[in-house]
Amino acid sequence: MRFAWAVLLLGPLQLCPLLRCAPQTPREPPAAPGAWRQTIQWENNGQVFSLLSLGAQYQPQRRRDPSATARRPDGDAASQPRTPILLLRDNRTASTRARTPSPSGVAAGRPRPAARHWFQAGFSPSGARDGASRRAANRTASPQPPQLSNLRPPSHIDRMVGDDPYNPYKYSDDNPYYNYYDTYERPRPGSRNRPGYGTGYFQYGLPDLVPDPYYIQASTYVQKMSMYNLRCAAEENCLASSAYRADVRDYDHRVLLRFPQRVKNQGTSDFLPSRPRYSWEWHSCHQHYHSMDEFSHYDLLDANTQRRVAEGHKASFCLEDTSCDYGYHRRFACTAHTQGLSPGCYDTYAADIDCQWIDITDVQPGNYILKVSVNPSYLVPESDYTNNVVRCDIRYTGHHAYASGCTISPY
């Protein structure tokens, strides 16, 4: 019994030296994190940004030697075309193997090449290792990534962004008719110039403005508005003299005969404003420049006596190419830089804009004549002045107005 207890107590003590002397398997040190690798670089406002990653690096496929042979799984070597191989190099594996001692006597400070994980359909792993080793010997440095450039087209110093009708970056919310054609249909630089385009301000011939009588006849109507909503129009003297009395209040109403207008330049030259650019007037209410003292004049005449029954007013809107016929391109905008009307283009004024009316608050119901004159004072030379006036028959009932018989008249 005593012997059994002695064996149980002394047995573990005798095994301790044996366990200490036994060779222990060395543990591999923990893998150090791989080096950061630059993958993406871009430039913004003069600052260079880089995106670094620890992920695997994609190796593009290399061109193989056509005389190389691939070994089949059965051991026979035969010449056959090889398919591309996708290579991935892992930074963590490279750093771990570099610190592992070499069993074949290789110098410890000499790192092994990075491990590559590959996939190729139709080949065995042994043949893949041979191909990977050959590619490692002939592998060249990967090309540098191309420098990023600004994707926005270069702007011209002598051109304003708001004045280029072909600029797709132009802010055009204030005018829905601006840039309504495809902005990328820019004429080619080496092609023949279209009529009225690319000839600058020095052209042969003269402009010829012609108002559209049918456009006026189709959309003439009567509207009542309060003086509160006519404050901008009152600043530009678009109302009758009775609207400027001292006893007029904001909730008083005015009766307006509204009508649209569309003027075409059917001449061979640009219609440019009569005033120089430095003398254009800025109107803060309507947020545009007036480049002419009087572009149009509106009058309401008695049908029998041809006398003026409603006080007309001057309409000195800004000039621009609202739309053009097929084959012509817009070149002028309603800005402080360029204003005008190109040949083959139209300057359109809708009936619902300010000052596109005649104040008929003091006019009695009856038959009248609406007279719309374009370039009435002949401030800009034209090739023909006999087609600058439109006359329409107006029947006013006190609440409604009916337009008919609109034609072009020489007077």
Curated annotation (Swiss-Prot):
Region feature Disordered, mapped onto this chain: 58-163
Positions of the propeptide removed during maturation: 22-162
Positions glycosylated per UniProt: N91, N138
Residues annotated with Sulfotyrosine modification: Y181
Residues given in the record as Cu cation binding sites: H286, H288, H290
GO cellular component, one term: extracellular matrix
Record PTM: The lysine tyrosylquinone cross-link (LTQ) is generated by condensation of the epsilon-amino group of a lysine with a topaquinone produced by oxidation of tyrosine.
Catalyzed chemical reaction(s): L-lysyl-[protein] + O2 + H2O = (S)-2-amino-6-oxohexanoyl-[protein] + H2O2 + NH4(+)
Disulfide linkage: C232-C238, C285-C334, C318-C324, C345-C355, C392-C406
EC number of the protein: 1.4.3.13
Top-rank lineage group of the source organism: Eukaryota
InterPro entries the record matches: LOX-like_protein, Lysyl_oxidase, Lysyl_oxidase_CS
Cross-link (Lysine tyrosylquinone (Lys-Tyr)): K314-Y349
Keywords: Copper, Disulfide bond, Glycoprotein, LTQ, Metal-binding, Oxidoreductase, Secreted, Signal, Sulfation, TPQ
Gene Ontology BP terms: aorta development; ascending aorta development; blood vessel development; blood vessel morphogenesis; bone mineralization; cell chemotaxis; cellular response to chemokine; collagen fibril organization
Cofactor note: Contains 1 lysine tyrosylquinone.
UniProt entry tagged with the keyword Membrane: no
Family, similarity comment: Belongs to the lysyl oxidase family.
Subunit structure, as described in the record: Interacts with MFAP4.
Record's protein name: Protein-lysine 6-oxidase
Organism of derivation: Mus musculus
